[in-house]
Amino acid sequence: MIALIQRVTRASVTVEGEVTGEIGAGLLVLLGVEKDDDEQKANRLCERVLGYRIFSDAEGKMNLNVQQAGGSVLVVSQFTLAADTERGMRPSFSKGASPDRAEALYDYFVERCCQQEMNTQTGRFAADMQVSLVNDGPVTFWLQV
């Protein structure tokens, strides 16, 4: 399971002209689900995402996680993160989970974020989405479990 996390000052997701999720300061989480992923990996990745210390403390040092910084989380499904790009000119998605399995684990990940008392917003699974963000820093990390 893969999360591309970006520290943002604001972010939103629009589907068919409707805003489905919007946050101020916090994390935009692009989530990719691979074939061998399960709830245990989703738990571990959620723990890492919410605990990752990439927000500045009073001294300007990256020392706070999103909860400590009072931020929110916007989770967006992104199957392209599971692409194999090692060869050729076209990505292969053979490493990605089936749509049903990916959606179940995406929903599970979102629920785990909510259970941690995070203000959690979402996109819409498998939809054609427009994601807008202001990357703060820029600060972007690739987390994989």
UniProtKB/Swiss-Prot annotation:
The gene is dtd. This is D-aminoacyl-tRNA deacylase. It comes from the Bacteria. Belongs to the DTD family. GO terms for molecular function: D-tyrosyl-tRNA(Tyr) deacylase activity; Gly-tRNA(Ala) deacylase activity; Ser(Gly)-tRNA(Ala) hydrolase activity; tRNA binding. Its EC number is 3.1.1.96. It comes from Shigella dysenteriae serotype 1 (strain Sd197). The lineage of its organism: Bacteria, Pseudomonadati, Pseudomonadota, Gammaproteobacteria, Enterobacterales. A Gly-cisPro motif from one monomer fits into the active site of the other monomer to allow specific chiral rejection of L-amino acids. GO terms for biological process: D-amino acid catabolic process. It catalyses: glycyl-tRNA(Ala) + H2O = tRNA(Ala) + glycine + H(+); a D-aminoacyl-tRNA + H2O = a tRNA + a D-alpha-amino acid + H(+). GO terms for cellular component: cytoplasm. Keywords: Cytoplasm, Hydrolase, RNA-binding, tRNA-binding. It holds the Pfam family Tyr_Deacylase. The keyword RNA-binding applies. Homodimer. An aminoacyl-tRNA editing enzyme that deacylates mischarged D-aminoacyl-tRNAs. Also deacylates mischarged glycyl-tRNA(Ala), protecting cells against glycine mischarging by AlaRS. Acts via tRNA-based rather than protein-based catalysis; rejects L-amino acids rather than detecting D-amino acids in the active site. By recycling D-aminoacyl-tRNA to D-amino acids and free tRNA molecules, this enzyme counteracts the toxicity associated with the formation of D-aminoacyl-tRNA entities in vivo and helps enforce protein L-homochirality.
